[in-house]
From Swiss-Prot:
Organism: Agathobacter rectalis (strain ATCC 33656 / DSM 3377 / JCM 17463 / KCTC 5835 / VPI 0990) (Eubacterium rectale)
Subunit description: Part of the 50S ribosomal subunit.
Gene: rpmD
GO MF terms held by the record: structural constituent of ribosome
Keywords: Ribonucleoprotein, Ribosomal protein
Similarity comment text for this entry: Belongs to the universal ribosomal protein uL30 family.
GO BP annotations listed: translation
The protein's name: Large ribosomal subunit protein uL30
Disulfide-bonded cysteines: none
UniProt entry tagged with the keyword Ribosomal protein: yes
HAMAP family for the chain: Ribosomal_uL30_B
CDD domains to which the protein is assigned, alphabetical: Ribosomal_L30
């Protein structure tokens, strides 16, 4: 398992459930196509799982 993961916003949050919008914002994703590098821990994995249709995840 990688130490860090790259998460990229690939789908717009227009029309998304407000809870999902807040989760995406908490991950640091503000604009379409933005990529952030996050630690690969349980909290990050859970947040990414909740917004899986909106993001792409790659191990670093």
């Amino acid at each position: 398992m990688a130490d860090r993961v790259k998460v990229t916003l690939i789908k717009s949050t227009i029309g998304a459930v407000p809870k999902n919008k807040k989760t995406i914002e908490a991950l640091g994703l503000t604009k379409l196509g933005k990529t952030v590098e996050l630690p690969n821990n349980a909290a990050t994995q859970g947040a990414v799982r909740k917004v899986a249709p909106y993001v792409k995840v790659e191990e670093v």
